[in-house]
Amino acid sequence: MSGPEIPNLLSSLRSARGGRGRGRGRGGHASSSATHDSTIQGTDTDASVSRLSAVDLGYLDDPYAQYFVRSSAGPAARRLPIINRGTYARTISLDTLIESFLSADQSTGPDSTPKQIVSLGAGTDTRPFRLFASKARPGLVYHELDFEVVTSKKLRTVQAVPLLRNILTNVTQLTEHSWSSKPSGGEYYCHGQDLRNFSLSKASKEYHNTQDAPQEKPEITLPGLRTDIPTLLLSECCLCYLNGTEASDVLNFFTSRIPNLATIIYEPIRPDDAFGKMMVSNLAARRIEMPTLKMYPTPEDQRTRLRTAGFETVHHMTIEDIWQNWVSPEEKQRVDYLEGLDEVEEWKLLAAHYIVVWASRGSGFGNWGGVGVGA
């Protein structure tokens, strides 16, 4: 399904003290569907505030974050140092992989290879603004999927803010649930699509003309989706909130259509040790489940998951690994100088309970799969 931000394990540990991080909500039916969806959608504000906190303190450079935080609530909250560092580490890890994907096997000029990114449960993510504004992106096709209420709100924000409107120009309403733009020679699409519908649509076909057939669902259509170019499927704390079948059906939708496909999955892991149990308990107190966390609790489980889905080359690193290996000593010093971090051991525990798994199959990815490996 799609949806805005859901509190991740980093944030839930500190929710009692006001610290929340960014996650991608979308599933699990711990309560009634409407109530659960509302809970997920409400956490988008927490995530955008966490992002803005990291920006305001100098961790990240993101001039667009401010426009997705309600100013009527007063000054944006300042998150705890450990939350700000988590937001920073997660962002730079994904940015590094995405930029590497975009530059892999890439020439300059009119012969450059088109690339496509599909972001699941994008919420208030500012990445498309940052990508299209940083330099010309001819041939980049960028899709975001989320609950319709979220994508509609994003459209209103774009239309209301000149800086955003100047990036996502020529906005067009394609269908009742999808809108698009033509930024910097590229293409942007935003789809109001509950990711759980991928399973419902599949079930409609499988049980067609039987007494057990579920209520008929329309065919899943994503206007502008290309199947002929290298594509990156991004799940930033998204699929972990779907049940196992739903998550697999989302992956299958894309693997069955796009031969040259890569994915990045950012999710929590290790729910069975003492620290993991505490984090899961804190999430459960907020009536939030992470079904795939139970199904893929270890790094190897996550790797096997993607191999089973059809990906040929699979890599992983924990956030702790990425902090140690991808962040230069000079950058670590800069980040430390911003606030300092007293809870070093707690940070290591938190960072060890998040993983980034990236995988690819087919052509058009160059050495993308080996980014940072062995660094």
From Swiss-Prot:
Top-level taxon of origin: Eukaryota
Function description: Methylates the carboxyl group of the C-terminal leucine residue of protein phosphatase 2A catalytic subunits to form alpha-leucine ester residues.
UniProt cross-references to Gene3D superfamilies, sorted A to Z: Vaccinia Virus protein VP39
Protein name: Leucine carboxyl methyltransferase 1
Listed Pfam families: LCM
Alphabetical GO biological process terms: methylation
Keyword tRNA processing in record: no
Species in which this protein is naturally found: Gibberella zeae (strain ATCC MYA-4620 / CBS 123657 / FGSC 9075 / NRRL 31084 / PH-1)
EC number(s) per entry: 2.1.1.233
